[in-house]
């Protein structure tokens, strides 16, 4: 999966999906508008997430946990046990702890990017969207939205978005790619508008690490 795809909006819910009538029946247009409006209210965020990857051809499964920090516009930092990915909107640093290697590249986005910014700005222009149902949880209903890229050349086949109805925040996102690899991000904790410092989005290269500059 590409560096850009790892920015997800990122973002352990196992409930039966219900398609019966709910207290409020939402349309796709209403849900996407509410998501966009909620995103406009966020200047920065710190998200603790769990990531589950199921590789399509081998059925091997992996679990990770990490922290996503984001700040508008186009500033992201994703940290996990395996790697750190940082961008200031101009440059991307991808550091592998196991290899002690830093790959540096120019930050690029396209219409099918899964970065939070592009994802929200391009709804619904670049995706076919459908409502798949609801999940009942103690904290309230979760709305399940399925998105399919309109571009047949997209690396992503589909995205399932789990939205908390009473806050309009993303609680889980499931990405299926053309290799049938399914990547799930589940939000464990989220803090909004904490005034994250700009220096958070510049990577300090560890001494002695190998540098691969692709710019």
Language model regions located:
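Bacterial N-terminal signal peptides that target proteins for export
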Residues: 1-7
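N-terminal leader/targeting segments and the immediate start of mature chains
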Residues: 2, 17-61, 71, 75, ...
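Gly/Pro-enriched, hydrophobic low-complexity segments
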Residues: 129-208, 212-215
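Bacterial N-terminal signal peptides
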Residues: 8-16
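Beta-turn initiation residues at beta-strand->coil junctions
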Residues: 51, 80, 174-177
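Flexible, surface-exposed loop/linker segments and immediately adjacent secondary-structure boundaries
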Residues: 107-141
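An acidic-aromatic
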Residues: 65-114, 183
């Amino acid at each position: 999966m590409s560096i850009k795809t790892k920015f997800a909006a990122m973002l352990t819910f196992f409930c039966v999906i219900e398609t019966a009538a709910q207290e409020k029946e939402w349309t796709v247009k209403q849900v996407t508008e509410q998501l966009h409006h909620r995103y406009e209210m966020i200047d920065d965020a710190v998200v603790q997430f769990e990531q589950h990857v199921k590789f399509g051809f081998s059925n091997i499964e992996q679990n990770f946990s990490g922290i996503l920090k984001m700040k508008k516009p186009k500033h992201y930092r994703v940290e996990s046990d395996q790697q750190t990915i940082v961008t200031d909107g101009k440059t991307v640093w991808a550091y592998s702890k196991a290899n002690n290697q830093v790959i540096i590249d120019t930050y690029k986005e396209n219409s099918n990017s899964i970065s939070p910014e592009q994802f929200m700005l391009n709804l619904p222009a670049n995706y076919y969207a459908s409502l798949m149902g609801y999940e009942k949880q103690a904290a309230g209903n979760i709305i399940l939205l399925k998105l399919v890229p309109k571009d047949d050349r997209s690396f992503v086949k589909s995205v399932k978005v789990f939205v908390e109805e009473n806050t309009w925040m993303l609680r889980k996102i499931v990405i299926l790619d053309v290799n049938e690899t399914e990547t799930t991000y589940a939000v464990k904790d989220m803090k909004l508008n904490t005034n994250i410092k700009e220096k958070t989005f510049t990577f300090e290269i560890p001494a002695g690490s190998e540098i691969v500059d692709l710019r």
